[in-house]
Amino acid sequence: MNYNMIRLWTGCVTDDEFYDYCDKYGIMVWNDFWLYVAYNAVAQPEAFKANALDKVRRLRNHPSIAIWCGANETRPAPELDNYLREMIAREDNNDRMYKSCSNQDGLSGSGWWGNQPPRHHFETSGSNLAFSKPAYPYGIDHGYGMRTEIGTATFPTFESVKEFIPQKDWWPLPTDEQLKNDDDNVWNKHFFGKEASNANPINYKNSVNTQYGESSGLEEFCEKAQMLNLEVMKGMYEAWNDKMWNDAAGLLIWMSHPAYPSFVWQTYDY
């Protein structure tokens, strides 16, 4: 896939083989700890500290580790944040940066998570910078910076979709109303619906139809969707590359792949 950095969102990979391969192929690893903006309370702080110490000691000799990060889109509680910062400086020989938060403190926020036309990415940083404290003061045409999370809805190929969507549900696709409100349809269970509303599935469906024409069945829609996937991803990368070292520093696509068959946030499917 030509990635040169992989972010382990909330510390989601522990397998030695992953780190061995990253070492071998020169892929940098942004390594989160296990805290998330909506789930930041730690029931047993001492157990958390012991686990964090074990993690750093076990992985610190992997040259692929580039950054340790305390939490996703928030900061750890002060007690844990201070512990992580001091422990990493001590145990990892102060060789690597520790960031409290994945999208603040000099980073450029998060998002968007739905498909946007290429022009959008060239003309505005496209981020909800409200997360940044202090906020980026540069208006909409600056603030690209280092974006650690940006993505889009992404339909897999028909060959994949037919493996997890029952044939009786292939066509027609859910209506806009169903995408917005339905809980129980099979599409929503695979994150094409309200479960992933910030991927804007209605806009994704309408963009495929508007830009590449109405389809007569699922296979045709999936084929056209690949063109939209390419256009949106290409726009993100090219916009950041166009401004590289002139406001932009890099971006990490949310995300590489899903843990479950899905219609959102992937560069290759389950």
Which stretches of residues belong to each language-model region?
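Hydrophobic faces of well-ordered beta-strands that scaffold small-molecule active sites
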Residues: 6-8, 29-32, 98-100, 146-151, ...
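Alpha-helical structural signal in soluble globular domains
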Residues: 17, 21-25, 58, 83-91, ...
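Active-site region of glycoside hydrolase catalytic domains
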Residues: 56-179
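Flexible loop/turn segments at secondary-structure boundaries
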Residues: 13-16, 37-39, 74-78, 106-108, ...
